[in-house]
Design a protein with these regions (language model features):
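Conserved SAM-binding strand-loop segment of SAM-dependent methyltransferases
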Residues: 2-8
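A conserved structural/catalytic subdomain of Rossmann-like adenosyl-cofactor enzymes
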Residues: 12-242
Length: 242
């Protein structure tokens, strides 16, 4: 099919107005300040209206991650369906209390039944940062058995990685073929599951939960954290997503 590349500032200059796409992948810059450039800031604020790209709300100016996500959502094909994969830092999951722009955007994802899966990725996957990152998967034509639910996958373990022979900046690992295959299988099964995980510091192997399926209703009252030792757990903080 036709292939086109557009050079420009995504948030401030939409090069694909009126177009929709069936598959979209993105790794937007982490923590980009969308308020520095006045032209971009004005365009973003202008699109924060009913029917605009950013109608759900605006995050704080020091992190535009959820603006990039909303931009992609605005390009979803409502007839034939679309799937989005986007790598984000932890801010979109944890920042903002109830009523904030962050919270309103997250609420939109649930109200429209778009959020399908969030994968916590291992650290040291990127050249310029060693932070924990998350792969979000969204769909607008989800099958009945996946609707109103979100799957959290904890892939932030050495079992999912391959050590590089030479570091590339802060990038020390990449997701291994076996790790990617297991993540894909867990995503397809869309249910709770456990794996044997070895912890680096102790060398001990534990059989732990690496995937947790939540109803949207439960997710409204739940946040997810991944820390050392890397495991997934849930804390009840009702002021985050309501």
């Amino acid at each position: 099919g036709e292939q086109k590349l557009f050079q420009g500032v995504t948030l401030g200059d939409d090069k694909s107005i009126g177009k929709t796409f069936n598959f979209m992948l993105a790794n937007p810059p982490f923590g980009v300040d969308w308020g520095k450039d006045e032209r971009t800031k004005k365009r973003v604020q202008d699109d924060n209206c009913p029917g605009g790209r950013f109608e759900a709300g605006l995050p704080s100016t020091n992190d535009g991650s959820l603006l990039f996500l909303q931009h992609m959502i605005s390009k979803m094909d409502k007839v034939n369906g679309s799937r989005i994969g986007i790598v984000l830092n932890g801010s979109p999951l944890f920042n903002g209390d109830a009523g904030s722009g962050w919270s309103n955007i997250r609420k939109m994802l649930l109200d429209r039944n778009l959020l399908d899966t969030i994968v916590a990725l291992p650290k040291n996957l990127f050249y310029g940062t060693d932070i924990t990152t998350y792969l979000w998967i969204l769909e607008n034509k989800r099958p009945a058995e996946r609707r109103d639910k979100v799957l959290f996958i904890d892939a932030a373990h050495a079992e999912y990685t391959r050590l590089l022979q030479k570091n590339l900046g802060k990038k020390r690992f990449e997701v291994s073929e076996e790790g990617a295959e297991d993540i894909l299988n867990i995503y397809r099964e869309f249910k709770n599951c456990t794996r044997d995980i070895r912890y680096e510091k102790t060398g001990e192997v534990e059989h732990i939960e690496v995937a947790k399926l939540l109803d949207y209703e439960d997710f409204l009252y739940t946040t997810v954290a991944v820390r050392r030792p890397l495991r997934l757990w849930y804390e009840n903080i009702k002021d985050k997503y309501v």
